[in-house]
Amino acid sequence: MLPSRDPAGRRREIDPLALYASAIDTSDYVAQVAPLVRRSVPVIGDLLDVGAGGGQLGHALREPEGRWAAIEPSPSMRVRLSALDHPPQLVAAGWNEAGVPPERHDTVLAATMPATMDEPEAFLARCRSWTRRTVVWVVPAHAGPRGLCFAGCLPLEWHGEDETPGIDIVLRGLSPSSMPRHVSFADWTFTGIVPDLDELAS
C-alpha cells in the first residue's frame, strides 16, 4: 500500500494494484494485446489466468463456452474479478501455492506477472503442468521501470529503478529448451487518469 492523506489530512492507503488496474481500464492495452494473442492462439478453450489482476485481458480472451479460472492472491483484485459479468472461478493463492489440478486448462495466461522475470524457469514449469496445450506470457518489452506504475513519467535518477526491458530478463533466465516458439510485439499506450494528483504525489 502507498500512504496518502484524505481531505481532512488523515493518512490513508492507496492500493498500487488497484491504481494499476484502473490505468489498464483507461489504456489501449487490451485492444492492442488481445488480438495479437488471438492470432497466435486462435482457440483459447478453457483458460487459466495466473495473476489475473483486474482480469481485463483474460475477460477479453475467454470463450463463452470455455471455463475461465483466475489465480489471484490480492483480496482487492479478487473483489474486482468477482464483480465482472461472467466472473472467473477464483483461486485465492499465489502461483506457487495454487492447488490447480494438472492439465485442466487448454491455455495458461500470465500477463505482466513478476514471476516471469523473477523465476522464469520455475514459473514456466508450473504453467506447463497446468496446461493441455498452450502457455502465453505477456511481458514488458519497453525500457522503463516496472515497480511504481507512474514511475515511467520520471527521469531514471528520480525513480532509481532498473529499466532493463522485461523480455530481456525473461529470455536471459530461460534455458535453451524453454525458449518460446513464438514472440510477438504490441505497441500500446499506458493511460492513467488521476483525479487528484496532489493525493497521488503525497
Would you name each region that the model predicts?
Residues 1-42, 44-53, 136-162:
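Conserved class I S-adenosyl-L-methionine
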Residues 54-97:
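Class I SAM-dependent methyltransferase SAM/SAH-binding core
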Residues 107-119:
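A short SAM/SAH-binding and catalytic strip from SAM-dependent methyltransferases
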Residues 121-136:
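A short glycine-rich, Lys/Arg-flanked "PGG" loop and its adjoining helix->strand segment in the class I
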Residues 162-201:
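Substrate-binding/catalytic lobe of Class I Rossmann-like enzymes that use SAM or dcSAM, i.e.
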Residues 100-107:
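A short acidic, Gly/Pro-enriched loop at the edge of an enzyme's catalytic core
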